[in-house]
Amino acid sequence: DTKILRFSYSSMTTPREIYDYDMDTRMRILRKRQEIPSGHDASRYVTRRIFARSHDGEDIPVSLLYAKDTPLDGSAPLLLQGYGAYGHAGPASFSAHRFSLVDRGFVYAIAHIRGGTDKGWRWYENGKLEHKPNTFADFISAARHLCQEKFTREGRIVALGGSAGGMLMGAVANQAPELFAGIIADVPFVDVLNTMLDEQLPLTPPEWVEWGNPGADEKAFKTILSYSPYDNVRAQKYPAILVEAGLTEPRVTYWEPAKWVARLRELMSGGGPIILYTNMDAGHGGAAGRFDALKDIARE
């Protein structure tokens, strides 16, 4: 038995802090605070939570970070990040890397779309299997709402997502390319239908609970076909897209991003460029070394 509860806290403007809370005296004691070697003045920044209305009336939480002197008249560039899969909730926590962009006038936004558990288990259930298209609609709705509220404007948004979030990037590139100046897709799962049909791939059967089994279920086949990024590339103008792959990647094999890039380059009617970067020594998580990982972030 103990009367002390230890917890941690951070926000998009506050580095991680660890506290002890005495449940008898109701006193809170700061035990440790994350040090930022380059320095950090939280008073220079604003973090907010707003909500965007999706196609079916659901309110999509969007977390924002920007400098206090950023003009909110639609002129600011905006980086919009999303994932929306496997029940993973995207925490609006502190990351020192973001401030390089924010200090240069960017608004940084995280769309807490369906497929995660940001609003509970129902939020996850309504973004998987036959409900997967909600994930993409939510992200597009968040982007449009940010334009309507003058945090940015169409053509000033860069979208960012990796793995299943890379699938999100591919889907929104097909469905609403006019919204984005650029898209960054890290190890993107973009050939969804072919991968889910190939049960010889060791990671395919465990994934059927998330996406459906198109080889055994016609409804799952049609749903996946409706959004699979590779299968829905068409002759239209695309934003600039940076695609990153890893040669030793066991989850999203390197040829998936490569064939997607080839299809985009073949069919697109304008826009781009479409750039493929393959790390010859990296897997699903990107570069392993601390400094190499920082180079990955800087490249993006």
Model feature map: region roles:
Residues 8, 65, 81-82, 160, ...:
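Short hydrophobic segments within beta-strands
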Residues 46, 58, 76, 153-155, ...:
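Exposed loop/turn and edge beta-strand positions of beta-sandwich/beta-sheet ligand-binding modules
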Residues 70-120, 192, 253-254:
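Short substrate-entry loop that stabilizes the transition state in hydrolases
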